[in-house]
Amino acid sequence: MKIIAFLGSPRKEGNTELLLKETIRGIKDSGFSVQIFNLNSMNIQPCQDCGGCDDTGECIYHDDMDVIYNAIRNTDRIILATPIFFFSVSAQTKLMIDRCQCFWCEKYLLKKPLQPGELGRKGLLLLVGGMKKDIGVQCSEACATAFFRTISIQEHSTLSFLGI
């Protein structure tokens, strides 16, 4: 089983990273490996909404997203770990999600959705927030759900840790 994880926190060794590491430790204890993408340290340009991916499903800009695109295409499980900033996912996480517009075009315009593979594609959303209110979870969940559906993940779980 292929598993990838996106770390969307700008804080090195922050709460989001610590929780992701614990999650990955459990996965490794089960005999699987995880490819981690630290979004804060990657060279990812923002989506320009240029329409360049409309006809091909491929982004015309080439940066570290090229590696992410390949990983998303070939994975069975995706972990999206992000702090909650201003009631949503972090800027680093949103930047990566926005650049997945090419998958949206591929799925909805070109009618070529990513295939679920033998194991099916599943996701996990890990959220960490300082506030104790659920509004940040709800807004982050909406963003993550749109992302997961775009990349053919129909089933995902959410773990949220608030007030830390």
Q: Predicted regions span which residues?
A:
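Glycine-rich phosphate/pyrophosphate-binding loop and the adjoining helix
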Residues: 1, 24, 29-30, 134-164
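Short, histidine-centered active-site or binding-site loop motifs used for metal coordination
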Residues: 7, 127-130, 162-163
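Short, glycine-/small-residue-rich phosphate/pyrophosphate-handling segment
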Residues: 108-154
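N-terminal beta1-alpha1-beta2 submodule of the flavodoxin-like/Rossmannoid cofactor-binding fold
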Residues: 1-105, 110-113, 159
